[in-house]
């Protein structure tokens, strides 16, 4: 394979109107979506939305042994959670239904028969050992006589027994195409042999169903991972044959191969790697917009000096020619930082509502929350907003608000010292007589009593109070937290903590 020239000057649309753009995302329902798959879905979605085209969701479930209804449901739910909506596909329908490949087998069988009759494909009755013995002679064979060393009788015997595969004939010449990301790509003839499209037993393979569905569904552009680059010349052969047979639109899609996503150790990120599955990010409380923003940066940038943007802004600015062909490294820390930026972009009501499911899961609030629980969440949200990287972090930060006063446990590292008893005594005296228990009045009372009255530095003055109120040395802003808890709870906690100090 050789690659020449960047793709920046290519005609992206290939002569069609922008609204005629049709792209597809074809996941296999064999497990949770991988972040690499999500990146591909996002780039296809952004490409379609940028041009006002059509985003097709097509399910590649021909592997019956591994495809499950549960996984299919997971794919659909995950895309909805991400906000990647599809114009055609499962549960939406469309002019090229069905969109599950398992329901399109009759179409594939019909196309295979036409390919054989047209001399584009053939039944291969050779065994693997016989093919190896042929060596280079097996690379490109005559569809009219693909097994010349077998007798007619032996071919008939193997045919009746179903002992054959169906191969696509590949012309014996180099295959070149223009890639929107990589420029001119050429594969030499010896590297693109005749290939199997239907395995023994009749199951169609990806090498058949993928380009057949592209042709039948009028797909104009194929944006996918670099790992599939080597399959492109075979698909180009199939597109050409289908066009000559009058199958589909007769148009060969324009390809763009996205950079590989690398994980730790400079290895390609795989499904087995920690941090590669979408479900992990949902569980941790990443925002869909934050995760998509970071995945967009794996090979593309909205501007040289800007990393944070929305999905809508990406769609408006997206240019496939600006996608880099170099491998993109997945950086968990940057992903976390981008997510934190998106959390800070939310208004307080929206963020509070997003936090609630994590508090429910932790057993801190009911589902739905009681009115007083919601008021606590809503009141505390602006206190922790700047400190959150993920939504799940809110659980530990807010746990003290939803814990009974007599159940607050002081962390070992925050254990109160005997000399801090006087601080707690002064704090109790300072706040128990306040006319109003607001954060401003609590702060004024405690500063006056502890900092000015006892002559303590703020850290030494407020540390024991924070421990008594929250059980920890680290918490949301102290005075606002006490105001949220109210006078009674705050005093109960202060007195209970004071009783534990000798």
Say what each PLM segment does.
Residues 23-29, 56-61, 217-223, 276, ...:
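Glycine- and acidic
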Residues 114, 122-123, 127-257, 262-269, ...:
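Active-site cores that bind ATP or allylic diphosphates and position pyrophosphate for catalysis
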Residues 59-63, 226, 259-262, 335:
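Acidic, glycine-rich active-site loops and adjacent beta-strand->loop/helix elements
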Residues 352, 412-473:
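C-terminal accessory/binding modules appended to enzymatic or scaffolding proteins
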Residues 242-247, 254-408, 470-502:
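Catalytic adenosine-cofactor/nucleotide-binding cores of aminoacyl-tRNA synthetases and other
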Residues 44, 75, 115, 119, ...:
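Residue-level signal for inorganic ion chemistry
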Residues 2-138, 203, 232-240, 245-250:
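N-terminal Rossmann-like or analogous alpha/beta NTP/dinucleotide-binding catalytic cores
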Residues 73, 233, 312, 444-447, ...:
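A generic structural signal for well-ordered alpha-helical surface patches
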